[in-house]
Curated annotation (Swiss-Prot):
Its main location: cytoplasm. The gene is COX23. Keywords: Cytoplasm, Disulfide bond, Mitochondrion, Transit peptide. Residues 101-143 form the CHCH domain. This is Cytochrome c oxidase-assembly factor COX23, mitochondrial. Required for the assembly of cytochrome c oxidase. Residues 1-86 are annotated as: Disordered.
Length: 151
């Protein structure tokens, strides 16, 4: 007996997929028709006058404080992470001994994204690398000052 060629198998599976998709489209059309008739028969007042509750991060640029209102440039922070955050201390304490924990993970991701955007030209992403280094320095100095909090 002769085995069927791979093209025959592919063709038969494609026809099954296209039939399945056609059936799905038919079901969607039926569902849309039913839901349309249901909503037109429904005469209850809608509560669209109430705005939905705001959830998630603040997206309005005018409400975000990028730089603190201080004249001292040493208080400026040029990276999104806060390595001295109690959450970072907790996560660091929970990790296994052989695991690595990076409290400056967001800065690290930003530097990698910059490299990917700029065809891995390191000179264009130097600011991101500097921000990551500053974050790591802050974390290491905080760990050295209060060793017991980080263990």
């Amino acid at each position: 007996m002769e085995k069927p060629s791979p093209t025959r198998r592919q063709t038969s599976s494609l026809s099954t997929i296209s039939n399945g998709m056609t059936m799905t489209n038919d079901n969607r059309d039926t569902t849309n028709t039913n839901s349309g008739s249901t909503s037109s028969n429904n005469s209850q007042p809608s509560s669209s006058s109430t705005p939905p509750a705001a959830s998630g991060p603040v997206t309005d640029r005018t409400k975000v404080n990028y730089v603190p209102k201080s004249d001292d440039p040493s208080s400026f922070q040029y990276y999104p992470d806060d390595p001295e955050n109690p959450v970072n201390k907790y996560k660091f304490a929970l990790k296994a001994d052989s695991q690595y924990y990076d409290p400056c993970e967001e800065s690290s991701k930003l530097s990698f994204q910059c490299l990917e955007r700029n065809d891995y030209d390191r000179s264009k992403c130097q600011e991101y690398f500097d921000a990551y280094r500053e974050c790591k320095k802050q974390w290491l100095t905080a760990r050295r000052k209060n060793r017991q909090q980080w263990e």
